[in-house]
A protein has these predicted regions:
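Basic, polyanion-binding surface patches
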Residues: 1-185
Length: 185
């Protein structure tokens, strides 16, 4: 038996992406965006309303960063999603965030968030879909495995459950991609 819910925007997991930009004065801005992910090879997409300060900044600078919210930074990352830079221009600092300028794009890397995807704007359509070219991915060494790869367990990213409005941690590994299915004959 199944229960029908009708049309809902429920996909699991939904990464909690923290979008970083600079304004026209070179000051950092940041917002929380749960609707985003990979768009194509070396491309990301994130849904942003046109009235966001972040949207204005991306259109002006042509660049942005996406960082993954973590369990350790859940309060700060939630804060930048519930407060608008149009109303609280210094919300980046109020969240306790610090930044360094990306070496690859005109956007900030948030020091407190361990993994960042650095992007140049490809296009921003009238529906609020922002598509960016991935120019670089950087990560703090403490979240790398012994093989030098990003370790999801060490990253400890949170995901957003839009049906309950809860942030969740990822669980344990369930299997190896492109390998588990080979067991079926």
């Amino acid at each position: 038996m199944r229960k029908n819910f009708g049309p809902k925007s429920w996909l699991y997991p939904m990464p909690v992406l923290i979008v970083g930009t600079y304004n026209e004065k070179g000051e950092p801005n940041v917002m929380n965006a749960a609707w985003g992910g990979i768009y194509d090879t070396n491309q990301v997409m994130v849904c942003l309303a046109h009235e966001h300060k972040t949207t204005e900044n991306i259109k002006k600078t042509g660049a942005f960063t996406l960082s993954f919210a973590t369990a350790e930074t859940v309060a700060e990352c939630d804060y930048v999603g519930i407060v608008s830079a149009n109303d609280v221009p210094d919300k980046f600092a109020r969240a306790g965030f610090h930044h360094v300028k990306s070496n690859f794009v005109n956007a900030p890397i948030i020091a407190e968030l361990p993994m960042t995807v650095e992007c140049n704007l490809i296009k921003f359509n009238e529906d609020g879909i922002c598509i960016g070219e991935i120019v670089n991915v950087c990560a703090k060494e403490e979240i790398l495995s012994e093989k030098g790869q990003i370790d999801a367990k060490k990253l400890d990213p949170i995901t957003y459950d839009s049906s309950t409005h809860i942030y969740w941690r990822l669980g344990d590994a369930a299997g190896k991609a492109f390998s588990e299915g080979k067991k079926i004959k």
